Amino acid sequence: MENVITNNNKGLPKSILKFIPEPIQPLFENPFFSAGFGLIGVGSILAMGRKGFQQAMIQSRRYFFVSVEVPSKDKSFHWLMEWLATKKNKNTRHVSVETTFHQHESGDIVSRINFVPSVGTHYVFYRGRVIKVERSREKNVIDMNSGNLWESITLTTLGTGRQVFQNLIEEAKEMALEKEEGKTLIYTSMGTDWRRFGHPRRKRPISSVILDKGKSELIIQDVKKFLNNSDWYNDRGIPYRRGYLLYGPPGTGKSSFITALAGELQLSICILNLAGKSVSDTSLNQLLATAPQRSIILLEDIDSAIQTGNHDLSAKSNSANAPSISSGGLQYQGYYGNPSVSSGGSALTFSGLLNALDGVAASEGRILFMTTNHLEKLDKVLIRPGRVDLQIEIGLCSSYQMEQMFLKFYPTDFDLAKQFVEKLENYKFSPAQLQAYFMTYSNNSIEAINNLNELIKK
């Protein structure tokens, strides 16, 4: 009996001990040590098995599943969010709320609440396939361009081809563009990125902005010619970009015409504020290079952003006439030298602006419009050909404009329109002044003629 008990308390069998070096065999003959060794061995085997299973799952996912990640910085992220909002899944328990705005033809703006998948994992069906949707958000990472937390959406499905995702994103894009059809999109600069500003606006009819005879047609035809002749520019090695300057007194319709032009040619408008604190030489180049396709880049009131003092371009600058930057924008007082940055001002230099417009790194495929109330304040180097290719004066109303504006409000009163022009032939008014006057007598053309003294006194 004792022999049996002793043999049962032995460690590893001799058939296994013979493979272990003799100096450490006594350790394995100890039953407690051998039991611990066995547990370690079993644990190691289980750990290896688990790791192998994980690797097998990773490999199988690589071979049998296809995924695509869409970061929040990309436009398609917002297309996908709108598309997912249309997928009514009753089983989805965790959603986020997004409010969008829509403008009716009447001009009324209504809000709409969309429920989109919140952060986490969700499933949707698309063309007979199950799509796994993983929305993630980095709590400590902020997109410096938008100021929002960094997000991404990862789509995963069974298969090896990416065509399903291409079709899905294309469908989401078409759905988003359909909502914008017939609208003018406005973008504003944010850091080095463009962000949508407000809601899409109804297109403004080009006929609603009355310029002097022939000027509207001239600009429209010039922009159309540019848009349709990219090959002509490339074949001749000419940079494919076009610059326009509209100058004239306030209230003459410069910005209004650009808005109507964008609607007429189905273009977006990108408003660039040069006096912004975040605008630098580098960010300006980035903004011009990444502007949305088929868009007008608008520099409004360029004279306010760039205040030019009296200086001799042929003279070398010194500390007294070196260009500097004020909190109101870029103040240029000399042609040579580099501007210095004052606290609270823009980090943009005058030379940086010139290089961004037509330097080596200047972007192509670009339509740039500048407006100014004071042409005399602009430096000639800024508006020379190559930077500004067409300058158009948008002045106070001519007789033609007065008559056309009268007929716009009173379409059938041709005789009264001529009387209106004759009575005001010795006076000058801006279109904004005339429009405000006509709106006072919007339904009575006779009163509009009889009360002209009100307009003249103003």
Swiss-Prot record:
UniProt subcellular location: Mitochondrion inner membrane
Enzyme class, spelled out: hydrolase
Chemical reaction(s) catalysed: ATP + H2O = ADP + phosphate + H(+)
Membrane association type: Single-pass membrane protein
GO MF, any single term: ATP hydrolysis activity
Keywords, alphabetical: ATP-binding, Chaperone, Hydrolase, Membrane, Mitochondrion, Mitochondrion inner membrane, Nucleotide-binding, Transmembrane, Transmembrane helix
Mitochondrial intermembrane side: 1-26
Source organism, top-level taxon: Eukaryota
Transmembrane segments: 27-47
GO biological-process terms attached to the record: chaperone-mediated protein complex assembly; mitochondrial respiratory chain complex III assembly; protein insertion into mitochondrial inner membrane from matrix
Record-listed ATP binding positions: G248, P249, P250, G251, T252, G253, K254, S255
Database matches in CDD domains: RecA-like_BCS1 (cd19510)
GO cellular component, one term: mitochondrial inner membrane
UniProt similarity note: Belongs to the AAA ATPase family. BCS1 subfamily.
Function statement: Chaperone necessary for the assembly of mitochondrial respiratory chain complex III.
PANTHER family listed in its UniProt record: BCS1 AAA-TYPE ATPASE
Protein name, as recorded: Probable mitochondrial chaperone BCS1-B
Gene responsible for this protein: bcsl1b
